[in-house]
């Protein structure tokens, strides 16, 4: 591959992602594999786990990746078609601490990509750009590595089933959206003692039923219809590569990740009083309040799973979660985001509570809030506007947080505007105790935004 064939736009903030056959080809992936192998060897790591999700391009791309890693002199262990968290698990289980998942996560079927962990660190930002620089400079190690195959699926299931215990049998609906979690999720929950109804658990990289992204309500319609037929304790939905979990209460309401986090935080803090819990800037104000109420220490941090993971590592916190649905349990687990494990922990805490799951969910704090709202810009344009907003913002009556965009917490609600790291959009989110407060906070943000750029077509 000449470097001219290396499209810079595939090197994203948290991973590598492109359109198969156009910006992401086997030849490109092979070069990236050699760069990852070179970087791993520079850090004294030469054994690398690789795995792939259920996309149609997976077998070709994982083979190219393995060739590239081997060309850098790495010993490659191919664990086959598995959820991304199983790749992370394998880096611990097999002691490699380095692994690459070939996955397009929740992107359309013609996309694929790489999530990369080297020496226990999930690559993001600069570290991902450095792989590109290595290839452009031809700063690549060569060697003759070997490629072997290993199956860690049973070890993964055993590890969870051996630790996460149900107090009573639960009846659950599981929707995998034809993503790669479809093989292991039903097995896991049956082994835990659940009665499982499967929706779209056949792995099919064309995603014929609905898109495997539980962050969007339209992708949860089928599961909601099934669960509200009655007799279910909960519904669980998984994203394309199994690192996020969506939750449906028996009455059909969506339990968004920041409200799920309240339950996980209480559970973890019941065993570790005073523990630290991390969440991202998009999460509800009630999460902060509930963590304090349960005797914990809340820490708000930047959105993005690699940022949250890094913060979790350096802080010694027990649990972290973000609004996108990535949840990281450090207590009893390894601190990586895993939708299947998150589902297992939810089932455990529901089964240990004397109340019916529907009551547990109903008792969670309720607020008036917006989903995530987006405003598109030309590439890079959103960063410039964000800088102007930060310079101009004045909210004397609010607690202002600027670790990731601008978040203003008022006595009765909050507003957030931040620049996305993955697409050229400004992201907004609003929450308040009532509709009047929500409108007031949105008005304040509206006037700030229009003072910076009067022609903005705001989504609120």
Regions found by a protein language model. Give the residues of each.
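Gly/Ser/Thr-enriched, mixed-charge loops and adjacent short helices
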Residues: 112-230
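An N-terminal, well-structured beta->alpha segment
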Residues: 1-67, 71-72, 98, 149-170
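Gly/Ser/Thr-rich active-site loops/lids in small-molecule metabolic enzymes
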Residues: 124, 198-200, 253-272, 338-348
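Glycine-rich phosphate-binding loop
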Residues: 96-111, 227-249, 254, 298-338
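N-terminal small/polar loop signature for handling phosphorylated ligands or for N-terminal nucleophile
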Residues: 47-111, 158-159, 187-248
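Phosphate-binding and adjacent anionic-ligand microenvironments
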Residues: 272-429, 434-460
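Proline/glycine-rich low-complexity loops and linkers
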Residues: 86, 129-158, 162, 251-323, ...
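Short glycine-rich phosphate-binding loop at a beta-alpha junction
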Residues: 45-53, 171-173, 275-281, 318
């Amino acid at each position: 591959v000449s470097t001219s064939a290396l499209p810079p736009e595939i090197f994203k903030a948290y991973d590598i992602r492109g359109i198969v056959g156009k910006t992401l080809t086997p030849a490109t992936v092979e070069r990236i594999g050699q760069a990852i192998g070179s970087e791993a060897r520079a850090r004294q790591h030469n054994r690398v786990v690789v795995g792939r999700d259920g996309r149609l391009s997976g077998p070709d791309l994982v083979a190219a990746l393995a060739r590239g890693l081997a060309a850098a002199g790495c010993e490659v262990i191919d664990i086959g078609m598995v959820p991304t968290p199983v790749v992370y698990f394998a880096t611990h289980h097999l002691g490699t601490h380095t692994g690459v998942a070939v996955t397009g996560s929740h992107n359309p079927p013609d996309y694929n990509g790489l999530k990369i962990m080297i020496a226990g660190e999930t690559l993001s930002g600069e570290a991902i750009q450095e792989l590109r620089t290595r290839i452009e400079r031809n700063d690549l190690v060569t060697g003759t590595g070997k490629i072997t195959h290993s199956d860690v699926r049973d070890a993964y299931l055993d590890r969870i089933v051996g630790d996460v215990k149900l107090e009573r049998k639960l009846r659950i609906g599981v929707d995998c959206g034809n993503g790669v979690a479809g093989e292991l999720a039903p097995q896991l929950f049956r082994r835990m003692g659940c009665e499982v109804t499967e929706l779209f658990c056949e792995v099919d990289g064309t995603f014929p039923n609905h898109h495997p992204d539980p962050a969007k309500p339209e992708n949860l319609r089928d599961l909601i219809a099934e669960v509200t037929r009655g007799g279910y304790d909960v519904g669980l939905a998984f994203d394309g590569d199994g690192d996020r979990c969506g939750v449906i209460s028996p009455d059909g309401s969506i339990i968004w990740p920041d409200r799920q986090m309240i339950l996980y935080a209480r559970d973890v803090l019941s065993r570790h009083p005073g523990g630290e819990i991390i969440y991202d800037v998009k999460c509800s104000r009630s999460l902060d309040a509930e963590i304090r109420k349960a005797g914990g220490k809340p820490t708000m941090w930047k959105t993005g799973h690699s940022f949250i993971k890094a913060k979790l590592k350096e802080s010694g916190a027990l649990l972290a979660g973000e609004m996108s649905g990535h949840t990281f349990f450090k207590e009893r687990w390894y601190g990586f985001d895993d939708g299947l494990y998150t589902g297992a922990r939810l089932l455990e805490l529901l089964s240990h509570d004397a109340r019916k799951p529907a009551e547990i969910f109903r008792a969670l704090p309720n607020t008036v809030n917006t989903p995530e709202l987006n405003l598109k810009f030309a590439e890079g344009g959103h960063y410039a506007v964000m800088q102007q907003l930060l310079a101009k913002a004045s909210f004397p009556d609010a607690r202002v947080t600027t670790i990731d965009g601008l978040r203003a917490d008022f006595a009765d609600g909050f507003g957030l505007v931040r620049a996305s790291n993955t697409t050229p959009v400004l992201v907004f989110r609003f929450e308040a105790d009532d509709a009047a407060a929500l409108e007031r906070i949105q008005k304040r943000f509206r006037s700030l935004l229009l003072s910076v750029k009067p022609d903005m077509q705001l989504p609120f």
